[in-house]
């Protein structure tokens, strides 16, 4: 009896843990997890020189606004549960450019740069990191996408100064900012930010990223070195964000399109302006 009860509890726990990807990825899949986005946003403070002096000053004065802004494009994931369509376009270049263009103080500038950094590093994820792991692991796009990005979150988490959920709900400033820039009510903004922070916190407490990373290291002996490789590839190309901050619109997509669409889009974009260089010699 006790063994049957334990088995049933394990089954229920597994079902609960795997329901997290199902909930968060019910719509369009995005890319890197929030922890990974916050890590790359951190680099803009001291490791990556921003050419615009106003933006450079802004991110150094308000690093927490920068890192909170790096979470905002993923509001697209919670728009339906927050009962608003205001965030349908939150993961698009034109939205991030509009946020930057409307910034009138250093806090707003830092937040907009964070949102831009989210989209910029997603280009690497969608066109290199995720396809590589769909090829190396298993070709189940939604599941592989979630597993790879959350394993990366675990791999990179020790380098974070603060967790994404804490920065999303640090004060009321972010909710006010979101309401203004996404043209929604303050109540809808607070609800969406709270739900995104709650989903992120639930994911961390579930220990699913750690489980995926641990299983991945057992089944894929080169996982750690490959993840370090992709971190280095993104870091090396991060200074190219200056071109986007200067108004350039990259040809590559920040959203995750169907595989056939992505492949068709990548061919004509190869070697064009506004495109981060493809990582050379991707390890397998």
Segments (PLM) and residue ranges:
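N-terminal leader/auxiliary helical segments
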Residues: 2-6, 10-114, 120-284
């Amino acid at each position: 009896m006790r063994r049957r009860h334990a088995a049933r509890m394990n089954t229920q726990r597994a079902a609960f843990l795997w329901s997290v990807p199902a909930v968060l990825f019910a719509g369009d899949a995005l890319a890197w997890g929030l922890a990974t986005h916050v890590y790359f946003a951190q680099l803009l403070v001291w490791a990556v020189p921003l050419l615009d002096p106003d933006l450079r000053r802004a991110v150094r004065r308000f690093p927490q606004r920068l890192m909170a802004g790096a979470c905002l494009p993923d509001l697209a994931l919670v728009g339906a549960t927050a009962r608003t369509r205001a965030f349908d376009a939150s993961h698009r270049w034109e939205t991030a450019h509009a946020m930057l263009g409307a910034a009138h103080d250093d806090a707003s500038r830092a937040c907009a740069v964070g949102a831009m950094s989210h989209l910029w590093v997603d280009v690497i994820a969608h066109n290199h990191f995720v396809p590589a792991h769909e090829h190396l692991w298993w070709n189940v796009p939604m599941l592989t996408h979630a597993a790879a990005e959350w394993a990366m979150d675990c791999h990179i988490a020790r380098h974070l100064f603060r967790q994404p959920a804490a920065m999303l709900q640090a004060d009321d400033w972010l909710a006010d900012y979101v309401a203004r820039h996404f043209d929604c009510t303050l109540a809808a903004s607070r609800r969406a930010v709270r739900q995104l922070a709650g989903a992120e916190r639930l994911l961390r407490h579930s220990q699913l990223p750690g489980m995926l990373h641990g299983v991945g290291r057992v089944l894929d002996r080169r996982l750690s070195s490959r993840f370090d490789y992709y971190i280095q590839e993104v870091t090396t190309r991060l200074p190219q964000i200056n071109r986007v901050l200067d108004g350039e619109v990259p040809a590559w997509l920040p959203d995750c399109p169907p595989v056939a669409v992505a492949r068709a889009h990548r061919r004509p974009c190869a070697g064009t302006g506004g495109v981060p260089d493809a990582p050379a010699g991707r390890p397998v």
